[in-house]
Amino acid sequence: MTKKIIVGVIVIIVLGVSFLNHYLKIGIPDHEGSLSVKGLNSEVPILRDVAGIPHIMAATEGDAYFALGYTMAQDRLFQMEFLRAAGNGSLSEILGESMLKSDKFLRRIMLRPRNPKEIFDNYPPRVKTMLNAFRDGINTFIKDDPDLPIEFRLLGHAPMLWSIADMMAIVKLQSWQLSSNYDMELIYRQLNAKLGVEKAAELFPYYSPKHLKILDAFGKSKPGDAELISQATQLRKLLGTNGGSNNWVVSGERSVSGKPLLASDPHLHGSRLPGPWYFAHL
């Protein structure tokens, strides 16, 4: 009886591991073979190097950016969906009610443009072609590939089709992540109210009282400073945003070439996995 129990447990474990292994492999990108997709004008070979970086060879820029959107969605779809939701203030659709405050905050700072068509119409024709092709590549992958990455299946969420406005919102989200003025303005206003202009200026010497007028648009009906700061802090933690970028310059008098040296080290959250950058060769 004991042997039968042991054998039964082993069988259950083996079957469980096999099922889990199969479940985890669903949605893993397949970089081999060939595909026939709508939207391309000609054949586009895509070679992956040992690091998995795609090398896209296309006859036109439109085809190149279509393929870029397709391969990026193939490799990073959940990360892209998360950023799309953050830019639109719809994180609660993915992560539940706990994100409602963050969504309200994101919508308050208006990352998504109110009139994206007006902005898009002012872009040069070449940029329009690139953006449209990139969007079409993403959406083609979403529509054609039924096997979603495990994150979607665990959360019971399906990716949305992309628009140009989504891209604009993500660009503004990236800019907001790299700035700290929002938080500093609110903190300074609190200090100014409690300590007075002169003492507050000692702590923030680069601020001027005239800059306080920028906060008038919030109005009395909006959340208080403390709540706004808390919401911004919560969101930065969720997005993995931390300060620390730095720049420095060396005088030409101290360089071998006799010319000044300028260095920049933007800390664009490179410690996160997956990282903020997607390497590709077009």
Language-model-derived ranges and their functions:
Residues M1-I5:
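Positively charged n-region of N-terminal signal peptides that target proteins for export
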Residues I6-L20:
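Hydrophobic membrane-insertion alpha-helices, especially the h-region
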Residues L20-L261, P266-W277:
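Substrate-recognition/specificity elements adjacent to catalytic centers across diverse enzyme folds
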Residues L282:
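Glycine-rich phosphate-binding loop of nucleotide-binding enzymes
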